[in-house]
Swiss-Prot record:
The gene is lepA. This is Elongation factor 4. The lineage of its organism: Bacteria, Pseudomonadati, Pseudomonadota, Alphaproteobacteria, Rhodobacterales. It is found in: Cell inner membrane. It comes from the Bacteria. GO terms for molecular function: GTP binding; GTPase activity; guanosine tetraphosphate binding; ribosome binding; translation elongation factor activity. It comes from Ruegeria sp. (strain TM1040). It catalyses: GTP + H2O = GDP + phosphate + H(+). Its main location: membrane. Belongs to the TRAFAC class translation factor GTPase superfamily. Classic translation factor GTPase family. LepA subfamily.
C-alpha cells in the first residue's frame, strides 16, 4: 500500500511517430523496472501490428519505482494510450484515470493534428501538462521554434519544456524529476466505499478477462465480491496485481493505485470501458461520471476469397471479438461474394487493424466490401431505422428523409498546400468552420459528412499535400441531406456488394466513374455485357462491354453470301441466348478497385 503523496499517475500524449513508445521504453529502462536482457523496442506494444505500424492500439500500463533526488521513493504509474482518433474513447478513459500528461512533440516536426486532439482531452480531464521536446539529437531539431509553436497553437507555457532524446537517453533523468515535482499526487479516501474505474480489459486464455482498474476511493482485496455498476454483473475477485510490465500479484490496491484484477469473467463484452466497479455489499451509491458505451461508426462486409474458409473466418472473428468489445459482427450473404460477415468498427484504422490481424494471425485472404456509415432513415409512418448496409435500403416511396453522420475535421497543413486542401474539402461536401495560422502552417476546421471521409479522404489528403498534412476528427451528430442508394447492375443483374449511398448531386458523376472502371476490370465474354448504375428504376450511367467475336465465316470459300448470312444469323441467335443464360464472372480485383473511387 503506497502513500497517496508518493504516487504519480501520468500518460504520454503524442502524434504518431513522435517517439511516445520510445520515451516509455527509456523511462522503464533507466529506473531498472526491466532488466536490460529483457528489454526490447516498444516494450508496451504487445501486438505485432502495433510494432509494425508504430502505433499503440490498446491502453497499456506499467508501474515504475523511482528514487528521486529528494531521497524519497515514488511509484510512477504510466498508462500508454493509443494516439489515433478511432480509439479516442479509450484515450479519454485513460486520461480520466491519471492526473498528468507528458506532451511529447518531435522537435523536427512540430505540433500535429493528433497531438492537438489528445492534448484537448488532457485539458478536459484537468491534467497538469509537462511539454517534452523529443529527438533533440537530430540535426533538423529546432527546439525554440517548436516551443513557440506549442505556446501559439495549444496555449501551454513551454519555456521550461524538457529537452530529450528518447533514442539516446538524453534528458530522461530530467523527465523523471519533472514527473515527481510538477505533476500532482492523486486524491482519494481509503475508508470510503470502493470506486474503481475500469480503464481497459482484454482476454487471456488461462485467466479469463483481465481488467485494468484505477482505484479512486476505497480498497480492493483478493476475495472481495464486486459489482459492475453499468451491467450489474457480480464477480468474486480471484487475483489482484500490478504490471511491471510483467504481471506481479499483490494483496490489495488502495486509492490512487493502478493495477489489474481477474474474476473468472468469461467475455470482454461484460466489462465496459469507463464503467465503475464497487463492492457488491456496502458499495458506492453513484457511479463515476462520463461513461459512454462504444458505438461502431463504420461498417463493411468481410468475405473469404476462398469460400471453404468461411468457418475459419467465423472462428477468427469470434476470437477477435473476445478481446475487443467495440467490434461488432453478424452473418451476411451476398449473391456476388457468398457467405461472410457484416462488421462494425470505430473507424477506418480500426477496420484496417482487424482486417490485417485476420489475414496475418489466421492466414485467411479477405475481400472487404465498401465501408459504409450508419444512416438514420425516417419513415413516413414515423419509425426511425438504422441502415448499416446500403443493400438493405427500404422502398424510397415509404421513406420521409435520411440523416447522415457528420464529423468535425481538424487539418494542419503547410500554407503552400492550403488551396488544395480547401478544394478537397469542398469537393467532399465540407462546410468550412474555421481557419487560423500558427507560424507557416494553417489550421483548418471543417464540418464534413463521414461518408465522404471513410473511403480515401486520408490518402487523397496525403497526396495533395505530399504527406505534410495531419488530420484528426470527432463525431458531431447527424444531419438530413439529399442521399440516394446507387445500385450497380452487370448484365441486368444487381451486384449487391457494389451498392453505395451517394449524394444525389454527385450520383451521376460517381455512377459514370464506377461503370467506366468496371468496364476496364471485367474480362470480355462471348456476349456483350451492359454495365449500369441506377437510382431506383432510373439508369443514370451505362457502359457496354463488347463481346469477343469468333469468325464463323472463315470456312466459307467462294462468294456465296446467303451461306455467310445464315452462319452470322445463327451466331447472333446463339449470343442472344447466351446473354440470357450466361453468367458474368466478376474478378475479386474488380470489387476492390471499383470501390476505390479516385475523384
Amino acid at each position: 500500500m503506497t502513500e497517496l503523496s508518493k504516487i504519480r499517475n501520468f500518460s504520454i500524449v503524442a502524434h504518431i511517430d513522435h517517439g511516445k513508445s520510445t520515451l516509455a521504453d527509456r523511462l522503464i529502462q533507466s529506473t531498472g523496472t526491466v532488466q536490460d536482457r529483457d528489454m526490447k523496442e516498444q516494450l508496451l506494444d504487445a501486438m505485432d501490428i502495433e510494432r509494425e505500424r508504430g502505433i499503440t492500439i490498446k491502453a497499456n500500463t506499467v508501474r515504475i519505482d523511482y528514487e528521486a533526488d529528494d531521497g524519497e521513493r515514488y511509484v510512477l504509474n504510466l498508462i500508454d494510450t493509443p494516439g489515433h482518433v478511432d480509439f479516442a474513447y479509450e484515450v479519454s478513459r485513460s486520461m480520466r484515470a491519471v492526473e498528468g500528461s507528458l506532451l511529447v512533440v518531435d522537435s523536427t516536426q512540430g505540433v500535429e493534428a493528433q497531438t492537438l486532439a489528445n492534448v484537448y482531452q488532457a485539458i478536459d480531464a484537468d491534467h497538469e501538462i509537462v511539454p517534452v521536446l523529443n529527438k533533440i539529437d537530430l540535426p533538423a531539431a529546432d527546439c525554440d521554434r517548436v516551443a513557440e509553436q506549442i505556446e501559439d497553437v495549444i496555449g501551454i507555457d513551454a519555456t521550461d519544456a524538457i529537452r530529450v532524446s528518447a533514442k539516446t537517453g538524453i534528458g530522461i533523468k530530467d523527465t523523471l524529476e519533472a514527473i515527481v515535482k510538477r505533476l500532482p499526487a492523486p486524491t482519494g479516501e481509503r475508508n470510503a466505499p470502493l470506486k474503481a474505474m475500469l480503464v481497459d480489459s482484454w482476454y487471456d486464455a488461462y485467466l479469463g478477462v483481465i481488467v485494468l482498474v484505477r482505484i479512486m476511493d476505497g480498497v480492493l482485496k483478493k476475495g472481495d465480491q464486486i459489482k459492475m455498476m453499468q451491467t450489474n454483473a457480480r464477480y468474486g475477485v480471484d487475483r489482484i496485481g500490478v504490471f511491471r510490465p510483467a504481471m506481479q500479484v499483490v494483496d490489495e490496491l488502495g486509492p490512487g493505485e493502478i493495477g489489474f484484477i481477474t474474476a473468472s469473467i468469461k467475455q470482454v463484452r461484460d466489462t465496459k470501458v469507463g464503467d465503475t466497479i464497487t463492492h457488491d455489499k456496502k458499495g458506492a451509491e453513484t457511479a463515476l461520471p462520463g461513461f459512454k458505451p462504444s458505438v461502431p461508426v463504420v461498417f463493411c462486409g468481410l468475405f473469404p476469397v476462398d469460400s471453404s474458409e468461411f468457418e475459419d473466418l467465423r472462428d477468427a472473428i469470434e476470437k477477435l471479438a473476445l478481446n475487443d468489445a467495440s467490434f461488432s459482427y453478424e452473418m451476411e450473404t451476398s449473391a456476388a461474394l457468398g457467405f461472410g460477415f457484416r462488421c462494425g468498427f470505430l473507424g477506418l484504422l480500426h477496420l484496417e487493424v482487424i482486417r490485417d490481424r485476420i489475414e496475418r494471425e489466421y492466414n485467411i485472404e479477405l475481400i472487404t466490401t465498401a465501408p459504409s456509415v450508419v444512416y438514420h432513415i425516417f419513415m413516413k409512418d414515423g419509425e426511425m431505422l438504422e441502415l448499416h448496409n446500403p443493400a438493405d435500403m427500404p422502398d424510397l416511396s415509404k421513406v420521409d428523409h435520411l440523416e447522415e453522420p457528420r464529423i468535425k475535421a481538424t487539418i494542419l497543413v503547410p500554407d503552400e498546400y492550403l488551396g488544395d486542401v480547401l478544394k478537397l474539402c469542398q469537393d467532399r461536401r465540407g462546410i468550412q468552420q474555421d481557419l487560423s495560422y500558427a507560424g507557416s502552417r494553417a489550421m483548418v476546421v471543417y464540418d464534413l459528412p463521414l461518408n465522404e471521409v471513410v473511403f480515401d479522404f486520408y490518402d487523397r489528403l496525403k497526396s495533395v499535400t505530399k504527406g505534410y498534412a495531419s488530420f484528426d476528427y470527432q463525431m458531431i451528430g447527424y444531419r438530413a441531406d439529399n442521399l440516394v442508394k446507387m445500385s450497380v447492375l452487370v448484365n441486368d443483374e444487381p451486384v449487391d456488394a457494389l451498392s453505395t449511398m451517394v449524394h444525389r448531386d454527385r450520383a451521376e458523376q460517381r455512377g459514370r466513374a464506377m461503370c467506366e472502371k468496371l468496364k476496364d476490370l471485367i474480362p470480355r465474354h462471348m456476349f456483350k455485357i451492359p454495365i449500369q448504375a441506377a437510382i431506383g428504376g432510373k439508369v443514370i450511367a451505362r457502359e457496354t462491354l463488347s463481346a469477343l467475336r469468333k469468325d464463323v465465316t472463315a470456312k466459307c470459300y467462294g462468294g456465296d453470301a446467303t451461306r455467310k448470312r445464315k452462319l452470322l444469323e445463327k451466331q447472333k441467335a446463339g449470343k442472344k441466348k447466351m446473354r440470357q443464360f450466361g453468367r458474368v464472372e466478376i474478378p475479386q480485383e474488380a470489387f476492390i478497385s471499383a470501390l476505390k473511387m479516385d475523384d
